[in-house]
Amino acid sequence: MSNVTPMMQQYLKIKSEYQDCLLFFRLGDFYEMFYEDAKEASRVLEITLTKRDAKKENPIPMCGVPYHSADSYIDTLVNNGYKVAICEQMEDPKQTKGMVRREVVRIVTPGTVMEQGGVDDKQNNYILSFVMNQPEIALSYCDVSTGELKVTHFNDEATLLNEITTINPNEVVINDNISDNLKRQINMVTETITVRETLSSEIYSVNQTEHKLMYQATQLLLDYIHHTQKRDLSHIEDVVQYAAIDYMKMDFYAKRNLELTESIRLKSKKGTLLWLMDETKTPMGARRLKQWIDRPLISKEQIEARLDIVDEFSAHFIERDTLRTYLNQVYDIERLVGRVSYGNVNARDLIQLKHSISEIPNIKALLNSMNQNTLVQVNQLEPLDDLLDILEQSLVEEPPISVKDGGLFKVGFNTQLDEYLEASKNGKTWLAELQAKERQRTGIKSLKISFNKVFGYFIEITRANLQNFEPSEFGYMRKQTLSNAERFITDELKEKEDIILGAEDKAIELEYQLFVQLREEVKKYTERLQQQAKIISELDCLQSFAEIAQKYNYTRPSFSENKTLELVESRHPVVERVMDYNDYVPNNCRLDNETFIYLITGPNMSGKSTYMRQVAIISIMAQMGAYVPCKEAVLPIFDQIFTRIGAADDLVSGKSTFMVEMLEAQKALTYATEDSLIIFDEIGRGTSTYDGLALAQAMIEYVAETSHAKTLFSTHYHELTTLDQALPSLKNVHVAANEYKGELIFLHKVKDGAVDDSYGIQVAKLADLPEKVISRAQVILSEFEASAGKKSSISNLKMVENEPEINQENLNLSVEETTDTLSQKDFEQASFDLFENDQKSEIELQIKNLNLSNMTPIEALVKLSELQNQLK
């Protein structure tokens, strides 16, 4: 440290306090970065990496960005998962002797971005915390940009992961280290996990008497937010407690497979349910819509209340169109209020706020003309006339972006300001008159009076006009020489400059003070503005539901008391939209308490997956309170939706396609109830034919005898189609296709009964496989059919009465048969004694205590995976 300059000593001291951040260290007009920070930042930002003290033995790596354009660089770093500590000069270098005092004024993290361009208008920017006291877990989350703050608690890790998936935070804060397995699961949502073991002594306004663990989670979250932001956050609302069980549950895989908010292939909004349903006109409405998709309701009363409003908007087209026009003039009130509280609001933001609240009376009057018994929100709308008057009387309609350059306030708003502005205006008039007079006096037509911040006002004469000109004769004093001109001042000009600049400086300083006062006045309306924003966002969502219902010919769903699902001429809303409406083939579906399993067969590409997905998506839309793409729709209210669709390795945790498939199936089989919906697509294809067939049958039997969940189960195992003889709750259906002159024609129509052909070779022909491969496959298929018969039998897989578990006899497997090729020596080498020592390890004890006779194959596989993870 002895060879380090005082400035670098200051840098190193501050950096030591923010080791997990990139430190933006203010030096004049730049933010500089040094050492490893500089290397990282230069790589990510693609800026030049240079060196400080380049001639010394150990030069310091450094890079920098201009302070006036720093926001875009910070956004880039934060979007790449970095935290940025902003260190400012707290004193004016011109007025400070010695080292300028510097300190970190804010830490920008992925979950605390507040700048207008740093967050997506249509997405919440959540930061989440959770604390664990097994078996109990409490979780709290906040959007700092809007002020939303919520908390909940539960007793299982599965719900924790479901909540994290639903909330989709950009940052997670914890108070202790977590298992690698849990960390991997969270990293599927966000890479930024912050461990904050030590909290400040500050106690935030959270009720700690209701629930200790929820208080701790919220306290942890708010402490971290205040630690990073270091300023007023009064816009953060009082914490709202909710219960996860009040909403339909869907895990990460269900939301991904159904493509609710992000498409699997493009990883974008386009092609998703959110994309389809978003006819909102405000950013607040768009964010609310995503929340509603992520959390469908399970309260029939709440669902029907939303549907009643959609009915009202659907029946009043003209009023709805007018409402959309009004909403189009409403800006993002939630985030505008957040910036007011945060202190980074500008005058243009307040003009946007003014325009937004000026639409509230129009919206209220419009809703008053409709059914007020249905539109309960009309009574909650509050025209903020007092705030509107304040903003109307104060700010000019088109103020500058900066609040420190003047030009913000109307004439007549403040008497003192008017006097300063008048003096400045008169001074500039005098300057214009002086310029005309000097041109006439000197005879130089190009003479001009200009200004810069270094020299103030001056008279400029080009060098061509100086040949026969004697400055002293006119009282001119040389101020600056340029290559093509000379600049002069006069006593008269200098005297007037002091008056003009003095008035301008005083006006700008006063305007900033007045703006701060105005900002504080607007801050008093925070709670009322947030309430209006919530109402407007809900109305925006509901009019959007009515808009798409009319545009795409949707119908109002009804909900059965006897848990029947009956869809008449149902369509997949997204697939229908991207293709010609008239080309889409609608299908029916009926599941009830007697028949609650559809076993779906049919060739690849025939539409089995689309059919299953559309049933799930229609259920989600209905429980959001939206119309659905059906001619008629009667639905139960589902508590959960489980899916197993598609093939995907979990590369992060090293799980194979089959293992992922089994884990997802395990969740459905373990947690599904008779009020759940299960979508299983081609279960068992990731293993051998007989293993897959056995597992598929076992799962169907388990659902039929245990959970009774409504289930759509597609398969290519045609042997399973005879299960309807043993399972009254199962019905065979198929997606029809015809073969005409060797060509396969997909009808996309779901019909009763099983299909007797997979048409695999015909599908391969559609994919333009080489003709030689197709011909050879047909020969091999003929040989198989000749030797084994067209239809296989599942006689070896018959159910055992009253025996839901699969044992060795059910599977018709023999340990002796599978091991007869192994020698005794092979067995001796493989069968080492796990329990040789008196002192047993925890994992050894777990293995020893397993009751294998009472475990299904899936449970055994999942348990083995858990033990493997513990050993990693």
Curated annotation (Swiss-Prot):
Q: Where does ATP bind?
A: G602, P603, N604, M605, S606, G607, K608, S609
Determine the domain of life of the protein's source.
Bacteria
Q: Which CDD domains match?
A: ABC_MutS1 (cd03284)
Q: Does the keyword DNA-binding apply?
A: yes
**Which GO terms of type biological process are on file?**
mismatch repair
KW ATP-binding (keyword) present: yes
Keywords attached to this Swiss-Prot or TrEMBL record, sorted alphabetically, are: ATP-binding, DNA damage, DNA repair, DNA-binding, Nucleotide-binding
**InterPro entries, per the entry:** DNA_mismatch_repair_MutS, DNA_mismatch_repair_MutS-lik_N, DNA_mismatch_repair_MutS/MSH, DNA_mismatch_repair_MutS_C, DNA_mismatch_repair_MutS_clamp, DNA_mismatch_repair_MutS_core, DNA_mismatch_repair_MutS_N, DNA_mismatch_repair_MutS_sf
Which molecular function GO terms apply here?
A: ATP binding; ATP-dependent DNA damage sensor activity; damaged DNA binding; mismatched DNA binding
Q: What cellular-component terms does GO give this entry?
A: cytosol
* HAMAP family, sorted: MutS
Query: Per its UniProt record, what PANTHER family does this chain match?
Result: DNA MISMATCH REPAIR PROTEIN MSH1, MITOCHONDRIAL (PTHR11361:SF34), DNA MISMATCH REPAIR PROTEIN MUTS FAMILY MEMBER (PTHR11361)
**Role:** This protein is involved in the repair of mismatches in DNA. It is possible that it carries out the mismatch recognition step. This protein has a weak ATPase activity.
**Protein family per UniProt:** Belongs to the DNA mismatch repair MutS family.
- Its name, as the record gives it, is DNA mismatch repair protein MutS
Native source species: Staphylococcus aureus (strain NCTC 8325 / PS 47)
